[in-house]
Amino acid sequence: MAGSNCGCGSSCKCGDSCSCEKNYNKECDNCSCGSNCSCGSSCNC
């Protein structure tokens, strides 16, 4: 478990790796603080 608030389309914390829900095997790595990350999208802090 990378983070509690890490879900597909949910807000991810900086440096947290978020696993996409649904039927996607992609992850959201290095999400920006307070930003929303889409499935398979990589955001920089």
Curated annotation (Swiss-Prot):
GO terms for cellular component: cytosolic ribosome. This is Metallothionein-like protein 1C. Signal peptide: none annotated. Belongs to the metallothionein superfamily. Type 15 family. Widely expressed at low levels. Coiled coil: none annotated. GO terms for molecular function: copper ion binding. Metallothioneins have a high content of cysteine residues that bind various heavy metals. Confers tolerance to cadmium (Cd) and plays a role in Cd and zinc (Zn) homeostasis. The keyword Lipid metabolism does not apply. GO terms for biological process: response to copper ion. The lineage of its organism: Eukaryota, Viridiplantae, Streptophyta, Embryophyta, Tracheophyta. It comes from Arabidopsis thaliana. It comes from the Eukaryota. Keywords: Metal-binding, Metal-thiolate cluster.
